[in-house]
């Protein structure tokens, strides 16, 4: 193996890092462990400085993590059916919180509304921490959240898990159903991660890196380490990853347009 230098580049919801990798030398020594948002969501939310289809060399998909619909225990919500039926019946009463406008949990919530017809007002917070605090305190009845913060809160009985937005049940919550198995076939809202480099990387370098990524998927210990982070490991080749980008971009573009989501 070779040593790796990790260079964290926050800013503009991943846009800063995307711009840097697009302009980096295409020699295989500068790679980006990316999240899907800048490729599938950001282009629908405003102007980006990179071309999703031309600025990068895709290597593959690594893992993905869904959102969870969670309720405060004082609410009447124990199932997705409860949420949909009650919110339709009492259309001016119920809301759901998220970590912010245009993030994966907001998109999960609006996607949920579009598929089920649930009537819920979106309450954006400045981060997942304040959102979870208000859910536990009863200031907001429902929350779309990443799974990590729910674990301890659910064990303490402070929140009630309803359903997860991935197609498979979460390893952390094996008893919590997916929307898909509850009858909303194909319902999936997952923030996922992959590996890519700048456009124009030599074919032999791409092949070597792709083989290395495939070996990661064959290493049970490494896959378990990835799963332990709360991100469900699944190594996919570049062609399947690109197809996933196209499908997700089409889905989120429609959700963003229909819900009139604007960047803050």
Where are these regions (language model features)?
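A structural signal for short loop-to-beta-strand junctions that line the ligand-binding cleft
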Residues: 29-31, 50-68, 94-97, 161, ...
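Periplasmic solute-binding protein
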Residues: 40-47, 62-76, 110-115, 192-195
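Flexible hinge/capping segments at coil-to-helix
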Residues: 71-92, 176, 182
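Ligand-binding pocket segment of bilobal, Venus flytrap-like solute-binding proteins
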Residues: 84, 92-176
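An extracytoplasmic/periplasmic, membrane-proximal ligand-sensing/linker region
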Residues: 114-116, 203-264
């Amino acid at each position: 193996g070779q040593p790796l230098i990790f260079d964290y580049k926050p800013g503009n919801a991943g846009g800063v890092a995307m711009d840097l990798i697009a302009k980096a030398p295409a020699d295989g020594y500068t790679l980006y462990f990316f999240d899907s948002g800048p490729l599938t969501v950001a282009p629908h939310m405003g102007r980006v400085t990179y071309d999703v289809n031309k600025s990068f060399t895709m290597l593959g998909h690594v893992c993905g993590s869904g959102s969870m619909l969670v309720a405060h225990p004082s609410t009447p919500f124990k199932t997705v059916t409860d949420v949909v039926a009650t919110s339709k019946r009492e259309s001016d009463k119920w809301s759901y919180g998220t970590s912010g406008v245009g993030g994966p949990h907001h998109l999960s919530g609006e996607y949920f509304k579009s598929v089920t017809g649930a009537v819920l007002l979106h309450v954006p917070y400045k981060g997942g921490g304040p959102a979870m605090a208000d859910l536990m305190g009863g200031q907001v009845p429902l929350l779309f959240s990443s799974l990590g913060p729910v674990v301890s809160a659910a064990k303490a009985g402070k929140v009630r898990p309803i359903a997860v937005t991935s197609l498979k049940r979460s390893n952390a919550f094996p008893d919590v159903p997916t929307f898909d198995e509850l009858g909303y076939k194909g319902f999936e809202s997952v923030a996922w991660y992959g590996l890519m480099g700048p456009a124009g990387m030599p074919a032999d370098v791409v092949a070597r890196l792709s083989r290395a990524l495939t070996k990661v998927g064959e290493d049970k210990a490494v896959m378990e380490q990835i799963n332990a982070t709360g991100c469900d490991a699944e190594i996919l080749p570049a062609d399947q990853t690109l197809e996933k980008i196209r499908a997700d971009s089409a889905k989120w573009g429609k959700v963003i347009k229909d819900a009139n989501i604007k960047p803050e």
